[in-house]
Amino acid sequence: MSRESLAGGVPVSLEPLQTTEAHAYWRTFVSGRTDLPTSDLQIHLDRYLALPPEEQRSHFSVKKDGRIIGTVRLGPAEISGFSMEPTCREEAAAALLKAMDLLRAGGATSITAHFEDIYESPFASLGFRRVFARMRMEAPTKRNAAPINVKLQPPEEDEVLGLTKFLMDVYEGHMEQAYGIHTGPEGEWRGYVAGLFKGDSGQFMPDASHVALEGDRIVGAILITHWMGMPLVAELGVAKDRRGRGLGRALLETAMGRLAGRDEPRLALYVTVGNDPAIALYRSIDFSQVGGQSVTARLEG
């Protein structure tokens, strides 16, 4: 089917989201996604209402016969927040074509898209090709932490510089850097690490976070935040010359024990598909995939 016949044969429209329709919009968004950190409609609605007006204006409703059947967020050359009401997924390609037309009218040529893999077929039909994907994993917390022969202590804000350099070393040459993850100059890294302490990725949980020390040297770290209703592994790293000795497992299990002591029943993390050593570690501690994969794809101009 050609793009022209697709666009002409399906009566869907794309309209800027009106605040009065925000509840219906986010209800539709949640209903069409399985890869979300939470299905709590109120959390998503509150996050939207807290955005500055220019960011609220990046949200568009997919409508049919005046009813919201889908959601999408548009950046200058980016599609995200895409979701369709489960009974209307056959309209996905037509909705995406409308979104692409808006972006191209604004001067976009190449377009990057972020979506759940249940929508990969309509994106692929319009020329998008997968670059990478990440998945959410969750595990029940438990108190039986593995023994560890290094000093553990909660990280403090004045350790931002040391943690920055540690994480930069951990991720140097990592497979994720090919996808633009964990890259950038030291100043950006420092801002990122400082932001974790300040709550940019959810409320920082110092009592569940640890750095592992050998003397004054950081050889491992786990940073936990409380993000969208559940504790999250914001960062986990082990020095390259200390890998394969159980330190990553010990850090995870220590954090899980602390969380269990706080009556937090589950812990979540995100991992890039293809990072097989990390996935194997997580599965060995009872982490399992929750929902679909979150895909990043690209349409070249």
Predicted stretch roles:
Residues 9-27, 151-177:
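A short beta-loop-alpha structural element at the N-terminal edge
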Residues 47-48, 74-77, 178-230, 236:
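A conserved beta-strand-loop-helix scaffold within acyl/acetyltransferase catalytic domains
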Residues 111-120, 240, 269-279, 296-301:
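Conserved beta-strand-loop-alpha-helix junction that forms the acyl-donor binding cleft
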Residues 68-83, 131-133, 204, 226-234, ...:
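A conserved beta-turn-beta hairpin within the catalytic core of GNAT-like acetyltransferases
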Residues 27-42, 166-182, 200-201:
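Helix-loop element at the rim of GNAT/NAT acetyltransferase active sites that forms part
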Residues 1-8, 76, 86-151, 155-156, ...:
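Acyl-donor-binding surface of acyltransferase catalytic domains
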Residues 32-103, 214, 222-231:
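Conserved donor-binding loop and adjoining core beta-sheet/short helix segment
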Residues 89-102, 238, 244-261, 280-284:
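Conserved acetyl-CoA-binding loop-helix of GNAT-fold acetyltransferases
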